[in-house]
Amino acid sequence: MDGDTVDVDIDLGFGMWMKKQRIRFYGIDTPESRTRDLEEKKYGLAAKAFVEASLPVGSTRTLTTVKDKTGKYGRILGKFKAFDSYTDAWVNLNQWMIIKHLGVEYHGQSKELIAEQHIINRGLVDLDAL
């Protein structure tokens, strides 16, 4: 798991489950948490920690998948809803992470095209406030 990919068990209803499914957050890219670039790693680990706090192990969340689409590595693409205690409302976690500068919008374009936005985000995200 990292800031834009999680492993989940999906309840399909009627006692049917899809276990240990890897879900790629749709429409977002976060900095890598497994990299030799220590600056990028710091922000990647912050995004990962934010996701772990928003989707704790054993919790139940709403996942909306993107119909008939998978990511580059065959992962299911999805959007999560998580509860934001500050606004006392359920929010689209994917968009919330972009708003908090933990990730950038991503729809399959090359990583080079979004690298600059990741660097800009480093100056905008408040790691202490997470």
Where are the model-predicted features located?
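Small beta-barrel nucleic-acid-binding modules, primarily SNase/OB-fold domains
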Residues: M1-L130
